């Protein structure tokens, strides 16, 4: 992206090929969304990761899921997930317990406080998403989602 505003960027021209422009645009949009969403979640005493754990549990059967499944859905390590879960439990948003059939498995369960917090956040979060997707038709959203899924699938093949 050439510097169209003639701002002084220390000589940086920003010339990228179309492939890199696309990837940079995706990252910028993602980071901008995350920054804005973080501000919303912070008002409720949550980080982005903590909110996502609550969202996953709230949409799991009986509000429960294993710590392993939750970390896989979020694409984070088990160790990181353990820290996030401990903080959520300390603040009363979830309960952590061992599975009665296999004590090696840790179950996470959303509490009424966690469910209420998800409800309280919904309006602000939905308004933010609506702002980001303003002007996109449902078809354009579906096409963009499919395209981004393809990019993500290709990224998994790279590893």
Predicted feature descriptions by range:
Residues 27, 55-62, 122, 149:
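Short, locally clustered residues in the helix-turn-helix/winged-helix DNA-binding domain
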Residues 35-77:
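N-terminal helix-turn-helix DNA-binding core of bacterial DNA-binding proteins
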Residues 1-14, 139-159:
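C-terminal regulatory/oligomerization modules of transcriptional regulators
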Residues 67, 85-86:
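Short, hydrophobic-biased segments on the C-terminal half of alpha helices
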Residues 1-44:
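N-terminal leader segment of winged-helix/HTH proteins
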Residues 25, 52-56, 116, 143:
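Pre-recognition alpha-helix immediately N-terminal to the DNA-recognition helix
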Residues 5-8, 86-145:
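Charged, amphipathic alpha-helical coiled-coil/dimerization segments
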